[in-house]
């Protein structure tokens, strides 16, 4: 069964569009899938099917400025002006909708890339409502974020918040192909599989096809800021299990260093966190044909252990 849902965004402007995928057999839990920057939730259909086959209801939406939500609202790359917690609060609204439809089930988050940042922000505010969180392809202190944030802040102060200046995106993300060799497409850092690169680049629902506003890029840098260090980790309930996974060739996680920084912040504040790095793989470990089944099986096993 598939429910299409919609709700008012925290930004007080957009309608957010989402889906709840329900397996035929009675469900043992719910997992909410949170997609990353410049993509949309239906890039995860393989994972969604695997989660359903394992007995989980899956809830997912397209963030403001992304995917169907951007198409229906005419707001490609524009996340609104309510700040860096907008997407996190929208994800919590989706949680409430899913829980109302299917009450009493253990509830998990899976967040990839920017989605992992949203999941970490969510865990700091609403973690007591969850049974576990998987963060995939997350970051530590993101390289160049503070410097880019300062430039964006100056542009916004000059009244350029609604403009889209690609140079800021280049400042923040342009270095990530530094070890990729061929960079003819520009997204090679996500995966070494040319099919995945081309599919991502050609997908009309990927927000990388449209420039992101300066205000939204600033909010993106602040999303990174609020989930840094032990100050963030102390806000996450100690009882919340966390599974931290990534590829060791992923620039978002500084090739493992940032991934382990997150684990160390959590462990130093008494948290239960399990970490797994996949050797030889870039950002989208769930899209490599040779390991995606194992990646998904690992997430399912983590959830099964924490029902």
Where are these regions (language model features)?
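Alpha/beta-hydrolase-fold enzymes
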Residues: 121-209
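Conserved alpha/beta-hydrolase
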Residues: 41-43, 48-74
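Conserved alpha/beta-hydrolase "acid-adjacent" motif
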Residues: 251-261
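Alpha/beta-hydrolase active-site loop
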Residues: 79-99
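Short beta-strand/loop motif that positions the catalytic acidic residue
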Residues: 244-246
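Active-site glycine-rich loops that stabilize anionic/oxyanionic intermediates
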Residues: 35-39, 113, 248-249
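Catalytic active-site module of serine/aspartate enzymes centered on a nucleophile-bearing elbow/loop
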Residues: 269-307
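N-terminal cap/lid segment of alpha/beta-hydrolase-fold proteins
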Residues: 1-23
């Amino acid at each position: 069964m598939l429910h299409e849902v919609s709700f008012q965004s925290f930004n007080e402007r957009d309608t957010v569009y989402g889906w709840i995928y329900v397996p035929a057999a009675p469900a043992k839990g719910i997992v909410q899938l949170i997609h990353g920057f410049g993509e949309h939730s239906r890039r995860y259909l393989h994972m969604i099917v695997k989660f359903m086959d394992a007995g989980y209801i899956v809830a997912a939406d397209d963030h403001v400025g992304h995917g169907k939500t951007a198409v229906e609202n005419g707001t490609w790359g524009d996340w609104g002006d309510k700040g860096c917690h907008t997407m996190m609060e929208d994800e919590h609204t989706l949680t409430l909708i899913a829980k109302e439809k299917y009450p009493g089930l253990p509830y998990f988050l899976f967040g990839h890339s920017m989605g992992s940042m949203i999941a970490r922000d969510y865990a700091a505010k609403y973690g007591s409502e969850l049974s576990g969180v998987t963060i995939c392809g997350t970051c530590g202190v993101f390289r160049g974020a503070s410097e880019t944030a300062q430039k964006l802040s100056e542009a916004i102060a000059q009244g350029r918040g609604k403009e889209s200046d690609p140079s800021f995106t280049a400042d923040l993300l342009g270095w990530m192909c530094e070890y990729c060799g061929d960079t003819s497409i520009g997204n090679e850092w996500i995966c070494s599989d040319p099919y995945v690169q081309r599919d991502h680049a050609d997908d009309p629902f990927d927000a990388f096809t449209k420039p992101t506003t300066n205000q939204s890029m600033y909010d993106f840098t602040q999303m990174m800021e609020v989930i840094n260090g032990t100050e963030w980790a102390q806000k996450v309930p100690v009882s919340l299990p966390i599974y931290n996974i990534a590829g060791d060739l992923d620039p978002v996680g500084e090739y493992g260093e940032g991934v382990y920084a997150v684990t160390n912040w959590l462990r130093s504040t008494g948290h239960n966190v399990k970490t797994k790095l996949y050797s030889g793989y870039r950002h989208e470990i769930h899209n490599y044909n040779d390991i995606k089944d194992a990646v998904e099986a690992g997430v399912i096993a983590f959830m099964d252990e924490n029902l």
